[in-house]
From Swiss-Prot:
<dbReference type="GO" id="GO:0016705">
    <property type="term" value="F:oxidoreductase activity, acting on paired donors, with incorporation or reduction of molecular oxygen"/>
</dbReference>
<dbReference type="Pfam" id="PF00067">
    <property type="entry name" value="p450"/>
</dbReference>
<protein>
    <recommendedName>
        <fullName>Probable cytochrome P450 127A1</fullName>
        <ecNumber>1.14.14.-</ecNumber>
    </recommendedName>
</protein>
<dbReference type="GO" id="GO:0005506">
    <property type="term" value="F:iron ion binding"/>
</dbReference>
<dbReference type="InterPro" id="IPR001128">
    <property type="entry name" value="Cyt_P450"/>
</dbReference>
<dbReference type="InterPro" id="IPR002397">
    <property type="entry name" value="Cyt_P450_B"/>
</dbReference>
<keyword id="KW-0349">Heme</keyword>
<comment type="similarity">
    <text>Belongs to the cytochrome P450 family.</text>
</comment>
<dbReference type="GO" id="GO:0020037">
    <property type="term" value="F:heme binding"/>
</dbReference>
<dbReference type="InterPro" id="IPR036396">
    <property type="entry name" value="Cyt_P450_sf"/>
</dbReference>
<keyword id="KW-0408">Iron</keyword>
<keyword id="KW-0560">Oxidoreductase</keyword>
<feature type="binding site" description="axial binding residue">
    <location>
        <position position="364"/>
    </location>
    <ligand>
        <name>heme</name>
    </ligand>
</feature>
<dbReference type="GO" id="GO:0004497">
    <property type="term" value="F:monooxygenase activity"/>
</dbReference>
<keyword id="KW-0479">Metal-binding</keyword>
<keyword id="KW-0614">Plasmid</keyword>
<keyword id="KW-0503">Monooxygenase</keyword>
Amino acid sequence: MSDLRRKRVKTNPIPDHVPPALVRHFSLFTSPGMAPTPNGDPHAAVACVHDDGPPIFYSPSNTRDGRGTWVITRARDQRRVLEDTETFSSHRSIFASALGEHWPVIPLELDPPAHGVFRALLNPLFSSRRVLALEPTIHARAGALIDCIAKEKTSCDVMKDFALPFTFSVFLSFLGLSQRRSEVLVGWVSDLLHGNAEKRRAAARSVVAFIDEMAAMRRKSPAVDFMTFVVQAKIEGRSLTEEEVRGIGVLFLVAGLDTVAAAIGFDMAYLARNPKHQELLRNEPARLGLAAEELLRAYSTVQIIRVATKDIEFEGVPIREGDYVSCPAMIANRDPSEFKCPNTIDLARQDNQHTAFGYGPHLCHGAHLARREIVIGLREWLARIPAFRIKEGTAPITHGGHVFGISNIILTWA
């Protein structure tokens, strides 16, 4: 399987300024453990970079299109990169490039000062008060899904039956969008993040058409919802352009859905394999807050990439203007210089300064909402479902990539 993936990923030549001693044939897409693997552990597979070799190295193929990147492995170095927006730019137009276009997903792909302007505009949507007001809905969505599962069966595919529909349902409620499109949106997001080039293009077109349709509808018929807020918003005394509305809509429709569902999936798989921890959290749900943070650390899912804006020497490494610089959270959060026994799950770990939601000015806008979804989802599951385990004869399938994921988690409590 991994050999097939290697053939599909193009490798670009190594730039002349990269010292041969800093080249490492490691990739979040093609290294061992990154291809879809039954009972895989991609997080342990990437944690091996801390065992030997330089703390910053050059990977000849570390993006979906086979582009080379510098890989920053230490947590403290990643924080420096993510804080320094002047030297390391976020502007890449990844989503638009799938359509052959060039516009930013907002505010994710903006740099200061524009980033700060748009982030301030959108902050009220993700305030603690607004998330708190949504908590009854989060509990209700989780409870209804789990009750339906428990009523009809003693086994389920937790991703298909719970994690994905739960996270999409909550986020659609958060955005004020109809639940009718949930299954279609799940398919679009899956194709965008994990599909081939053809599927990504088709999904991107569908998402853009959906956002444009919603924006046009809310311009004509305002409501109390996310899209009305966006089309009526003003920055620096002017209304947002159609491209800006689209850039915001794409980010908040796509970002956080697959990643939150994946976090719940990794958590469920861990608890299914560790019955003592499962029972502890079932009997003492007050521990779920710290436990969720530890599982976010251990099973982080996202690689963050920046582009160097100038030639620099960073920790003795010659980074040149235009170089891609990768900050994989799943590597930083297994850094032994940052976390004691990083490959051991400690559900009571204190001062857990992980970067599962990024770091610096681009810290995930929806981090608070995501945390509440994960904790409430686990709480409701443990309260309603008795001791569960991986069904005999089945195996969860994990994969690496730009976003790590897990599927085929067949749980049973018979």
